[in-house]
C-alpha cells in the first residue's frame, strides 16, 4: 500500500505484486527450442509458478513448478506433477508466428483452464533480446469459474531461442 500521484493529486493505492528473478547455468539445454512459463496469483491466496522446457516436437524436456499455499507453505512440483495441454492457438498478423494462447494446466490430478485477456500479446524483442515471443496476462478458471490471474510467457515458437541475438553491434 502507499500513495500514487497523478496530475498533482495524491491517491491511496493498494495491491499485490511479485518479483520474478530467472537464472540458469545455461540458456537452454541441447535439444530445447523454448519454454512455457506461468505465474498465477489464485483467489484463495495461494500462488503457482509452473514451467516447461520444450523440444521442437512440443514434448517436454523439463517440467517444474512451485505451489505456495496461502499460509506460506511451499510445495515443489516435479515433472510428473504437471501437464501442459494447448487448447487454442493464435497466429500473429505481424510475425506470422502461431502461439498456443489457451491451455489446460494439470496439477496433481486437478486442472486449470488458462485464457488470455486478449490474444494479441506478442512482443518483438529482435532489437534487444533477438527474440519474438508471446507474454501476457491470463485468467485461470476451474469448472468455468475464475479462480485467479497471472502472466504467461511463450518462447521459441517462431524459431529456437539462442544466445547472441539482439541488434547489430550489441
Where do the language-model regions lie?
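Structured soluble/peripheral alpha/beta segments that form catalytic or ligand/cofactor-binding pockets
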Residues: 1-170
Amino acid at each position: 500500500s502507499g500513495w500514487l500521484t497523478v496530475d498533482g493529486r495524491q491517491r491511496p493505492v493498494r495491491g499485490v505484486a511479485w518479483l520474478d528473478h530467472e537464472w540458469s547455468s545455461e540458456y537452454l539445454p541441447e535439444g530445447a527450442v523454448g519454454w512455457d512459463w506461468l505465474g498465477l496469483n489464485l483467489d484463495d491466496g495461494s500462488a503457482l509458478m509452473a514451467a516447461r522446457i520444450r523440444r521442437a516436437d512440443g514434448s517436454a524436456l523439463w517440467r517444474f513448478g512451485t505451489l505456495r499455499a496461502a499460509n506460506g507453505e511451499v510445495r515443489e512440483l516435479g515433472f510428473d506433477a504437471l501437464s501442459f495441454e494447448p487448447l487454442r492457438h493464435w497466429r500473429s498478423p505481424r510475425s506470422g508466428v502461431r502461439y498456443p494462447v489457451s491451455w489446460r494446466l494439470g496439477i496433481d490430478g486437478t486442472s486449470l483452464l488458462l485464457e488470455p485477456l486478449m490474444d494479441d500479446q506478442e512482443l518483438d524483442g529482435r532489437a534487444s533480446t533477438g527474440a519474438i515471443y508471446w507474454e501476457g496476462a491470463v485468467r485461470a478458471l476451474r469448472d468455468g469459474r475464475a479462480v485467479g490471474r497471472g502472466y504467461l510467457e511463450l518462447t521459441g515458437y517462431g524459431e529456437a531461442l539462442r544466445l547472441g541475438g539482439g541488434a547489430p553491434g550489441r
